[in-house]
Amino acid sequence: MVFVSKVHGEIKYEEKNKVTFKKGILGFKNLKEYALVDLKEYEPFKLLQSLEDDAAGLIVVSPFEFFKEYEIKLNDEDTNRLDIKNQSDVVLLTTVTLDSDPKKITTNLKAPIIINISNNLGEQIILDKSDYKIKHLLIEE
């Protein structure tokens, strides 16, 4: 499948990479359908592109690429809402805020994106009881 993004141009994706966010994503509550696309030239980063708004896309990354100790606990409500049966079906991503200075690139560890790859349902959750930050430096000195 092909989608044309205002920012990223022509994006090719497969149906299996389409993710539905029933509650939308923070800042994009009215947008529900996205494609998760590998950015091969910028690995390990990915693009979470809205399929409903050609100007709405987020750069995301697995937090484990940079923070091996990152840990969250999904509650039963989250697990039920996303119909998660196996932990191996869960993909965890965090949004990235880019900067021309790589030392200023941040990621949002406070509100990770959870995707159940067995049914392509996703949700961004807010970790109320954690010390994680909304703007956590990706590269710590």
Curated annotation (Swiss-Prot):
Compartments in which it is found: Cytoplasm
Q: Key word Acetylation present in the record? A: no
Q: Which GO terms describe its cellular component?
A: cytoplasm
GO biological process terms on file: bacterial-type flagellum assembly; regulation of translation
Keywords recorded for this protein, A-Z: Bacterial flagellum biogenesis, Chaperone, Cytoplasm, Translation regulation
Spell out the subunit comment. Interacts with translational regulator CsrA and flagellin(s).
Name the NCBIfam families on file: PRK13285.1-1
Family in the record? Belongs to the FliW family.
Q: What does this protein do?
A: Acts as an anti-CsrA protein, binds CsrA and prevents it from repressing translation of its target genes, one of which is flagellin. Binds to flagellin and participates in the assembly of the flagellum.
Name recorded for this polypeptide: Flagellar assembly factor FliW
Source organism per UniProt: Clostridium botulinum (strain Eklund 17B / Type B)
Gene transcribed to yield this protein = fliW
